[in-house]
Structures are given as C-alpha cells and as structure tokens.
C-alpha cells in the first residue's frame, strides 16, 4: 500500500472487550499462617468479570514487522456479599441453643493502567488483508482491597412454663480480615488479529490478546481481550 510499501509511523485507537480472571490466595486453616486464618469466602478468591475500555497505541511499521507502545485503563470492579446461617446446637428441656454466623464482605479490584510494548509480524495475503501475530511485554499497575468480617452469636431460646419464648445471648465472637495493596509488575502476553486496509494509510484492525500480569503478591491476574480499532499510518 503506497510507494513506501507500508512503512512509517502510525497511531492506533481501539475499543476492547476484556474478560478478566482474578485469583487471590489468603491464609488457610492448615497453612503456615494458621494463626491468621482468613474469613474471605471463595467468591472473592476466584473472580471472573469483564469490562470495556479504550486503548491507544503509537508505533512504527517496517513493512512487515511493527513495533508499538500502548496504554490502557480498565474499569474498577467492586462487589459486596452478605450471608447468614443459623445452626441448631441443642434442643432439650424446652431450651434450644443456636449458633448464628454472619459474613459481610466488600471487595474491589482495579487494573489502574497497563503500559505495553509489542512486536508484531504482518502476513500479507493480498493488497487488503494482513493477518498478524506478536508478543507483548507490559508494565501493569493494580490496586485491590478486601474487607471481610465474620461474626458468630450463640443464643439460648427458653420456652419453659409455656410462656412466650425468651432469648438470651450467651456468646459473641468476631473475626475480621482487611487487606489493601497497590502493586506494579511486568507481565507477558501474546497478540493475534487481522488488518484490513481501507485506504493506503488507514487500516481497520480486529485483534485478540492474552496477557498474564505476573505474580502480584498473593494475586494472579489474567486478561483475554477482543478489540476493534483503526490504525492510521503517516
């Protein structure tokens, strides 16, 4: 396309749909930190969500190989979960003992930014279509927090003498887990897609990328992204 065979600097703008998989590890009852048992439920240990976000890139096309730097920000994920369970412990002589367990959790996760550098090779099938593959290394910034509280209440319900039942609170316990991290790491990914030359300088781009954001302390974060954008070569 063009007398320079497609060479030159370019800019690209994409709209991406991202599937995000977030896995957290927290202290377990049998772990080395069993004195710090976490109250965090499985719901906040294995999060699957999605987001739509813009991405911008600047690069240089060498007429087959391309290199590009890109920047993206992701949507902040947050959720809360409350559960309650009442278990009967004893029931005799018109006295009933129950254990009430309440769990309140609030969690957030935000891939604040991703600054990447990619190398891409274009396969020229004809004058219009160019499938491509590539690799990407990126510096990512992630913030996440969790507040989890587990409260147990043991109470006695007495119906002695046929009178209205009387409830007595016998024992209360409360355990809380709070964690907040801001982490920066380098991760690796792969890129694939196809470009369609609308004009010698303007290309429609449909792409896919997988990125592993690296080991973020006790968190693993992976994204699968499908994107549609336009690339303009100067």
Curated annotation (Swiss-Prot):
In terms of superkingdom, the source organism counts as Bacteria
A Pfam cross-reference name: Opacity
Q: What start and end residues bound the annotated signal peptide?
A: 1
**One GO molecular-function entry:** porin activity
Q: Among the entry's GO cellular component annotations, what is one?
A: cell outer membrane
Alphabetically list the UniProt keywords: Cell outer membrane, Membrane, Signal, Transmembrane, Transmembrane beta strand
Q: Hey, which family's this protein in?
A: Belongs to the opacity porin family.
Protein name stated in the entry: Opacity protein V28
Q: Which InterPro entries match?
A: OM_autotransptr_brl_dom, OMP/PagP_b-brl, Porin_opacity
Report the subcellular localization.
Cell outer membrane
The role this protein plays is: Implicated in a number of adherence functions. OPA proteins are implicated in pathogenesis and are subject to phase variation.
């Amino acid at each position: 396309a063009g007398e320079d065979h497609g060479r030159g600097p370019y800019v690209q703008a994409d709209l991406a749909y991202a599937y995000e998989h977030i896995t957290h590890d927290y202290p377990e009852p049998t772990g080395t930190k069993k004195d710090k048992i976490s109250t965090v439920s499985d719901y906040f240990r294995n999060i699957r969500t999605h987001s739509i976000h813009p991405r911008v890139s600047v690069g240089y096309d060498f007429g087959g190989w391309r290199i590009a730097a890109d920047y993206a920000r992701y949507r902040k994920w947050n959720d809360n979960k409350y559960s309650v369970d009442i278990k009967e412990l004893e029931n005799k002589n018109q006295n009933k003992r129950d254990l009430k367990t309440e769990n309140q959790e609030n969690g957030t996760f935000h891939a604040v930014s991703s600054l990447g550098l990619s190398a891409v090779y274009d396969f020229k099938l004809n004058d219009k279509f160019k499938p491509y593959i590539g690799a990407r290394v990126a510096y990512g910034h992630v913030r996440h927090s969790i507040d989890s509280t587990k409260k147990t209440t043991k109470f006695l319900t007495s119906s002695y003498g046929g009178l209205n039942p009387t409830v007595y609170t016998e024992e209360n316990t409360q355990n809380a887990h709070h964690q907040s991290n801001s982490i920066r790491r380098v991760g690796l990914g792969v890129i694939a897609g196809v470009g369609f030359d609308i004009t010698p300088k303007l290309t429609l781009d449909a792409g896919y990328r997988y990125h592993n954001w690296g080991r973020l302390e006790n968190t693993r974060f992976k994204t699968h992204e499908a994107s549609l954008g336009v690339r303009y070569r100067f």
